[in-house]
Regions:
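Conserved redox-active cysteine motifs that mediate thiol-disulfide chemistry
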Residues: 76-96
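Conserved segment of the thioredoxin-like fold in thiol-based oxidoreductases
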Residues: 86, 94-133, 145
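A short beta-strand-turn-helix
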Residues: 50-72
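Hydrophobic beta-strand anchors of alpha/beta hydrolase catalytic cores
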Residues: 73-74, 104, 148
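Thiol/disulfide oxidoreductase modules built on the thioredoxin-like
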Residues: 118-126, 131-191
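N-terminal targeting signals for export/organelle localization
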Residues: 1-51, 170-173, 192-196
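Short pre-active-site segment immediately N-terminal to redox-active cysteine/selenocysteine motifs
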Residues: 70-72, 77-80, 144
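Solvent-exposed loop/turn segments at secondary-structure junctions
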Residues: 78-83, 109-114, 135-136, 164-166
């Protein structure tokens, strides 16, 4: 377990250096959202249970998604974020290819649910979108937008990527890596090669 956390931490450091630009100030939590904290444990920790209602009215529960999928990606965004809007078409291509194994949920802690619904309708994005409490973004350390939190089939936060991913091949590589049955071993071996 310690090797797994160390390997994932080193991977995060390496990937953060490759991150695109994030945009936007982190919104401060409102008093009403303070009661909705997740007790998030960070990279390498188990993601706490969370439930959201999508713009389509569907209730998504993390534990249920992880029974069906090998990877869940929480993408924090807001409508006036130019880098979020650049990332979405690329994310859509990757989602279309990997949706059997990967679920993406675009979480918006800034805009009203009606605005998110209108945005999704005009953008034709097929992955679920939902409003979320601002406290979730704060607790998960979202310092800029977009930020994506990758959660593996065991509920472990395996990557936090700050900034836009604007190359579909990057999504393909991440999805291939984190949906592989032996991804922890592959990452550990890759990192071991780097530090030799």
């Amino acid at each position: 377990m310690i090797k797994r956390i160390a390997a994932l931490s080193l991977l995060l450091i390496l990937l953060t250096g490759c991150a695109g630009k994030g945009d936007g100030e982190l919104p401060k939590p409102t008093p009403e959202s303070q009661s909705e904290l997740l007790t998030y444990t960070g990279l390498g920790g188990v993601m706490p249970e969370m439930t959201v209602t999508t713009t389509g009215g569907e209730t998504l529960k993390l534990s249920e998604l992880l029974q069906e999928k090998k990877l869940v990606v929480l993408n924090f965004w807001f409508e006036d974020c130019p880098w979020c809007l650049k990332e979405f078409p690329v994310m859509e291509l990757a989602y279309h290819r990997y949706q059997q194994d990967v679920e993406i949920i675009a979480l918006n802690p800034v805009d009203a649910p009606q605005a998110i619904s209108a945005f999704q309708a005009k953008s034709s994005l097929s992955f679920p979108m939902a409003a979320c409490p601002r406290s979730w973004a704060v607790e998960m350390g979202v310092g800029g937008y977009p930020t994506s939190v990758f959660i593996d089939r065991d509920g472990v936060v395996c990557l936090i990527h700050a900034g836009a991913i604007t190359n579909v091949e990057t999504f393909y590589t991440l999805f291939e890596t984190f949906t592989a049955d032996d991804y922890e071993r592959k990452i550990y071996n890759s990192i071991s090669q780097l530090v030799r």
